[in-house]
């Protein structure tokens, strides 16, 4: 059994859930991140217990690898089982969002209560687009393996999806992500390329648990995607592609509102 590194956060002592087992919030980070990225939001959602997961090749799971989406979904299921988590809400950002959608649609998730996706791509609709993306991701992976990481990251954060970042914010992210292990990032990037990802929209539309799509109001690419495919969209003010980092308070409020609407959580916890 392969289990991913993770950190548990107990509910607030005053939470009605503190003494009673209930659904967990399980958080999946993006490429180059770690479970710690979710800590500010998870703490603001403190009426729920949280599990902050390090995906393969990242954080404390840096030595773990994955053979595609099905394998990562299996590792996630085994991690939840090992931690005694039977009921959970799954939240994921960017790469973590894509993994979360795949897991919800195709994985073993008998206790899944709902799905929250931030800026996750649904996939590419035809083989030509998938092949082009696979080639692009292989080029990035080669750079992550061979070049100094700060140099690669400086170019990585120049991509159009990060256009909302100013130079200082880019510099901060390069410094923050420079402690990654380039070859491990490369392996994960190739294993989870959009070129390997199935087109998830049809399965998502058949999903039998509630789901929502969160997006920064400056993240034009994923705003357009959500609107094009009529996803249940909620936007975050003053935020780009990484909305939970830019505006954790607003993000946590959206999470709690969704959970309240979907599971009849008492309104008092929304104002905390």
Curated annotation (Swiss-Prot):
Q: Which reaction does it catalyse?
A: 5-enolpyruvoyl-6-hydroxy-2-succinyl-cyclohex-3-ene-1-carboxylate = (1R,6R)-6-hydroxy-2-succinyl-cyclohexa-2,4-diene-1-carboxylate + pyruvate
Q: What Pfam family is a match, any one?
A: Abhydrolase_6
Q: Which UniProt keywords apply?
A: Lyase, Menaquinone biosynthesis
Superkingdom of the source? Bacteria
Record InterPro entries: AB_hydrolase_1 (IPR000073), AB_hydrolase_fold (IPR029058), SHCHC_synthase_MenH (IPR022485)
Q: Which GO terms describe its biological process?
A: menaquinone biosynthetic process
A Gene Ontology molecular function term for this protein is: 2-succinyl-6-hydroxy-2,4-cyclohexadiene-1-carboxylate synthase activity
Q: What does this protein do?
A: Catalyzes a proton abstraction reaction that results in 2,5-elimination of pyruvate from 2-succinyl-5-enolpyruvyl-6-hydroxy-3-cyclohexene-1-carboxylate (SEPHCHC) and the formation of 2-succinyl-6-hydroxy-2,4-cyclohexadiene-1-carboxylate (SHCHC).
Q: Which family, according to the similarity comment? A: Belongs to the AB hydrolase superfamily. MenH family.
Task: Supply the name of the protein.
Answer: 2-succinyl-6-hydroxy-2,4-cyclohexadiene-1-carboxylate synthase
């Amino acid at each position: 059994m392969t289990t991913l590194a993770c950190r548990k956060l107990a509910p607030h002592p005053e939470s009605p859930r503190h003494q009673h087992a209930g659904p967990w919030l399980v958080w999946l980070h993006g490429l180059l991140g770690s479970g710690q990225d979710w800590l500010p939001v998870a703490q603001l959602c403190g009426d729920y217990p949280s599990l902050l997961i390090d995906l393969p090749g990242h954080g404390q799971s840096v030595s773990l690898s994955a053979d595609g989406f099905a394998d990562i979904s299996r590792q996630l299921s085994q991690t939840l089982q090992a931690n005694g988590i039977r009921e959970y809400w799954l939240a994921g950002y960017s790469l973590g969002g894509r993994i979360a959608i795949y897991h919800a649609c195709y994985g073993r998730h008998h206790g899944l209560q709902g799905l929250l996706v931030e800026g996750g791509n649904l996939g590419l609709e035809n083989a030509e687009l998938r092949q082009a993306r696979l080639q692009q991701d292989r080029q990035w992976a080669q750079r992550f393996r061979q070049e100094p990481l700060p140099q690669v990251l400086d170019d990585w954060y120049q991509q159009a999806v990060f256009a909302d970042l100013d130079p200082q914010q880019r510099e901060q992210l390069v410094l923050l992500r420079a402690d990654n292990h380039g070859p491990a990032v490369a392996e994960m990037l190739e294993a989870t390329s959009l070129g390997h990802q199935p087109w998830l929209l049809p399965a998502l539309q058949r999903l039998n648990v509630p789901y929502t799509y969160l997006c920064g109001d400056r993240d034009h690419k994923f705003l357009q995607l959500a609107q094009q495919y009529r996803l249940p969209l909620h936007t975050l003010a003053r935020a780009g592609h990484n909305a939970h980092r830019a505006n954790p308070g607003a993000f946590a409020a959206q999470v709690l509102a969704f959970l309240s609407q979907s599971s009849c959580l008492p309104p008092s916890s929304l104002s905390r």
